[in-house]
């Protein structure tokens, strides 16, 4: 089955999506939509497909089966709903949108229209992260007790000042937590389960933006485990994401995309990591050089379309991270 894809958005992430689609047999980018003529025309020249500057004629492009949203986060639900009403399957970049209210509206419309909805959390497809979930699920470290998750990244001032939407409440929904930290929020929920209690503080410590560039949250999981989450874009020069999970029988440490340590009460004889290098230097740059994670997420979504199954991260799964981010933001306003 030939899957023809339309891309919404003219930025770096839409280029990532286009490169990822090119690597999938039977998939083709046939149309691009963006409000910046220079950017969307560049994507069209670089990757093929018709360029549109208006959403309505883009969605009417007759040879599409699905769209991938790479637009500002706060536009996802509105654009996704419009696509679903045209019978198009919708795969959106993270987060699904900037509020659970908008997420719910998008989920409901896709269900009403009978189209698939997915959210791109590419970490779920990376080998060591999948293995982390498997090992913890199998009880390798016993009952999880403590989690320390650190997203201490750096973005220069131009990252915000050169964009009309980054670091804004209206279109980014927040700052370092909902944009950069949301991948790790999703990872924690996927691996360890629901969070039932939150205490938090957020602040703009370095950047002159209306939302936070730093967030700290204390999490209580339904399992009884306790966690500390840090997310910042103010930690020069930027450090790899690090997640340490300690259980009754030992500790597993993930650094960026790789397991770097498995320390157990009883000697562990298996491999520590199954990969040699991280896929992308996210700690210092938003540009995705290695598209394997995105390609796997898009392939999974196409498989769901072709076989009428659910993608690994469907709309309801994607909503979970936004719900926890909202809870952290609410907790940060309490004294």
Residue ranges and their predicted role:
Residues 1-47:
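N-terminal Rossmann-like dinucleotide-binding module
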Residues 61, 66-73, 77-124, 139:
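Beta-strand-loop-alpha-helix segment that lines the small-molecule cofactor/substrate pocket
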Residues 123-208, 335:
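Predominantly a Rossmann-like dinucleotide-binding segment in NAD(P)-dependent oxidoreductases
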Residues 53, 91-92, 117-119, 229, ...:
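Hydrophobic residues in well-ordered beta-strands that form the structural core
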Residues 108-116, 130-146, 246-247, 251:
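Basic phosphate/pyrophosphate-binding loop/patch that engages nucleotide-derived ligands
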Residues 179, 185-261, 291, 295-308:
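Contiguous beta-strand/loop segments that form the cofactor/metal-binding neighborhood of enzyme cores
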Residues 49-55:
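Conserved SAM-binding strand-loop segment of SAM-dependent methyltransferases
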Residues 1, 66-69, 104, 222, ...:
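C-terminal helix-rich "cap/oligomerization" subdomain common to oxidoreductases
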């Amino acid at each position: 089955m030939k899957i023809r894809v339309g891309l919404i958005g003219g930025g770096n992430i839409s280029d990532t999506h286009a490169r990822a689609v090119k690597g999938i047999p039977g998939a083709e980018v046939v149309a691009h939509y963006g409000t910046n003529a220079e950017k969307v025309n560049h994507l069209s020249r670089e990757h093929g497909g018709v360029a549109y500057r208006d959403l309505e004629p883009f969605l009417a492009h007759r040879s599409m089966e699905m769209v991938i949203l790479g637009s500002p986060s706060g536009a996802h639900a509105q654009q996704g709903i419009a696509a679903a009403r045209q019978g198009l399957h919708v795969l959106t970049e993270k987060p699904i949108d900037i509020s659970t209210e908008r997420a719910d509206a998008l989920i409901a419309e896709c269900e009403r229209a009978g189209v698939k909805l997915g959210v791109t959390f590419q970490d779920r497809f990376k080998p060591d992260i999948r293995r982390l979930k498997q090992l913890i699920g199998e009880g390798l470290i016993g009952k999880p007790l403590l989690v320390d998750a650190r997203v201490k990244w750096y973005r220069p001032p131009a990252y915000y000042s050169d964009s009309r939407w980054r670091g804004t409440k209206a279109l980014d929904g927040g700052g370092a937590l909902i944009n950069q930290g949301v991948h790790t929020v999703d990872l924690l929920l996927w691996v360890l389960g629901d969070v039932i209690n939150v205490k938090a503080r957020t602040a703009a410590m370095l950047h002159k933006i209306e939302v936070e560039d730093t967030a700290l949250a204390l999490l209580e999981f339904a399992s009884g485990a306790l966690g500390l989450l840090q997310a910042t874009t103010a930690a020069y020069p930027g450090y790899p994401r690090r997640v340490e999970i300690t259980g009754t029988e030992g500790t597993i440490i993930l650094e960026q995309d790789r397991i770097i340590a498995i320390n157990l009460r009883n000697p562990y004889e298996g491999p520590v990591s199954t990969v040699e290098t991280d896929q992308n230097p996210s700690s210092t740059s938003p540009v995705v050089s290695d598209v394997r994670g995105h390609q796997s997420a898009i392939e999974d979504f196409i498989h769901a379309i072709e076989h009428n199954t659910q993608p690994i991260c469907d709309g309801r799964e994607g909503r979970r991270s936004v719900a926890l981010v909202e809870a952290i933001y609410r907790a940060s306003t309490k004294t």
